[in-house]
Regions:
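Conserved catalytic-core segment of nucleotide-activated headgroup transferases in glycan assembly
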Residues: 1-59
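Catalytic binding pocket for nucleotide-activated donors in carbohydrate/polymer assembly enzymes
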Residues: 37-164
Length: 165
């Protein structure tokens, strides 16, 4: 329970920072209707959607915002899905992301301790179409070459092969 409360708190803090700075944010799911920011004109609340619809929406979005939950040393499928759908992934930092991605080249990251800098990072992407396309293209190539389920299966098979030796 405490874990879930923390995740909701962090996610709402990120959204609050963006909408209070004038950035419009589309969110999905009925739980947002209970948010203290539900009446903010910059928070656009949509109904729940399924996984496939989520991928379609990512493909139509210039930016896909991700907030990591408990795995601060890894990454989530949402990051790869955003990249594979040509959407700039904006996510909080993890040790894995910092080691495997390049800020401003194939991902945009933010630090939760400096959340006040996030709106400017998002505005920069929204205002610079060339930058957006540059990040999207690089992210797509990175995800396609390193972060598909086939890539993961090959990696696990390699590990298993090394264990058998």
């Amino acid at each position: 329970m405490c874990y879930q409360v923390k995740i909701v708190y962090i996610r709402e803090k990120v959204i609050k920072t963006l909408i209070e700075s004038g950035i419009k944010v589309d969110v999905f799911g009925d739980s947002w209707k209970k948010s203290p920011y539900a009446d903010n004109k910059n928070l656009i609340i949509h109904d729940d959607i399924d996984f496939e619809k989520g991928l379609d929406i990512m493909a139509q979005s210039r930016i896909s915002l991700n907030v990591m939950s408990w795995h601060k040393g890894g990454m989530t499928e949402r990051i790869a899905n955003a990249m594979l759908n040509y959407s700039v992934c904006v996510t909080d930092e993890t040790s894995y992301i910092n080691r495997h991605f390049v800020f401003g080249e194939n991902i945009v990251t933010f630090n939760l301790e400096n959340i006040d800098k996030l709106p400017d990072k998002i505005r920069k992407i929204l205002q610079d179409e060339n930058l957006q396309e540059y990040i999207e293209k690089n992210a797509y190539e990175k995800a396609l070459n390193e972060h598909t389920w086939n890539n993961r299966a090959d990696y696990f098979m390699k590990i298993l092969g090394e264990i058998e030796k």
